[in-house]
From Swiss-Prot:
Monomer. Endonuclease that specifically degrades the RNA of RNA-DNA hybrids. It catalyses: Endonucleolytic cleavage to 5'-phosphomonoester. The lineage of its organism: Bacteria, Pseudomonadati, Pseudomonadota, Alphaproteobacteria, Caulobacterales. One of its GO terms (molecular function) is RNA-DNA hybrid ribonuclease activity. InterPro entries: RNase_H, RNaseH-like_sf, RNaseH_domain, RNaseH_sf, RNaseHI. This is Ribonuclease H. The keyword Phosphoprotein does not apply. Keywords: Cytoplasm, Endonuclease, Hydrolase, Magnesium, Metal-binding, Nuclease. Residues 1-142 form the RNase H type-1 domain. GO terms for cellular component: cytoplasm. The keyword Metal-binding applies. It comes from Caulobacter sp. (strain K31).
């Protein structure tokens, strides 16, 4: 049986807005890849979106993936809200511009290349892979700030 690609993503922010980071853990069978990054001036929602975007953009061919996020914003946005936003020219129900439209459009393009099964996971609930994605997001933020991380290899 062919293993499936499983992805866990998370974002972190010190202040909102403030410096932030994103992290993603990609697992295929017994192989793992960890990616992270950050921004000096951002929001938690932008970092949550970036984690999913970067994970999907890291895939070099169309892939069937299961993507786990602890962000209700990302989960509801990508599975419910995005269809209406696109139909209304990237406007909300009250005709105002969609917040973070640049990232939503990028996520929409990234997911179009793949077959993604979106899954919500409760954050900070002891789920080992989600906790690792959270740690990667914090490390991404620390690296962006030029601070020392936890000392764990990434």
């Amino acid at each position: 049986m062919t293993p499936k690609l499983v992805i866990y993503t998370d974002g972190a922010c010190r202040g909102n807005p403030g410096p932030g980071g994103w992290g993603a853990l990609l697992m295929y069978g017994d192989k793992k890849k960890e990616i992270m990054g950050g921004d000096l001036a951002t929001t938690n929602n932008r970092m949550e979106l970036m984690a999913a975007i970067q994970a999907l953009e890291a895939l070099n061919k169309p892939t069937k993936a299961e993507l786990h996020t602890d962000s209700q914003y990302v989960m509801k946005g990508v599975t419910q809200w995005i269809h209406g936003w696109k139909a209304k020219g990237w406007k909300t129900a009250d005709k105002s511009p969609v917040k973070n439209v640049d990232l939503w459009q990028r996520l929409d393009a990234a997911r179009a290349r793949h077959e993604v099964d979106w899954r919500w996971v409760k954050g900070h609930a002891g789920h080992v892979h989600n906790e690792r994605a959270d740690e990667l997001a914090r490390l991404g933020m620390l690296k962006t700030l030029g601070e020392r991380g936890s000392g764990k290899a990434v």
